[in-house]
């Protein structure tokens, strides 16, 4: 789960870098990593986030699936699960090409492997 969280965070960061101001990319990374916090801690996500001070847009994406980061999270999950319909719909909504998303996904996977020293 930890590896998936790191890949998810990095992918969100790279996708956000295509469309959002640079200062928002760190928040996109946090959304990606924290989106699996409930699974990592085996508690509901809302409870896991109670003791963490996060910007409202991060919380909105994580708990409500709304806000600026929500489509990036949805696209990232579609990449992981192979949900082609959601992938196509959200990539189109974000005006990202398949090439951009696939390149970012490969970069995220490679980055996570480098962290593990593989």
What is the predicted role of each segment?
Residues 1-118:
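Conserved alpha-helical "signature site"
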């Amino acid at each position: 789960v930890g590896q998936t969280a790191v890949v998810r965070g990095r992918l969100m960061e790279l996708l956000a870098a295509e469309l959002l101001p640079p200062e928002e990319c760190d928040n996109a990374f946090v959304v990606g990593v924290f989106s699996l916090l409930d699974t990592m801690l085996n508690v509901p996500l809302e409870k896991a986030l109670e003791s963490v001070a996060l910007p409202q847009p991060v919380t909105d994406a994580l708990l409500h699936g709304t806000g600026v980061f929500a489509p990036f999270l949805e696209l990232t999950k579609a990449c992981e699960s192979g949900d082609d319909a959601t992938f196509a719909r959200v990539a189109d909504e974000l005006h990202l090409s398949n090439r951009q998303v696939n390149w970012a996904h490969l970069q995220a996977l490679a980055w996570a492997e480098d962290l593990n020293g593989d």
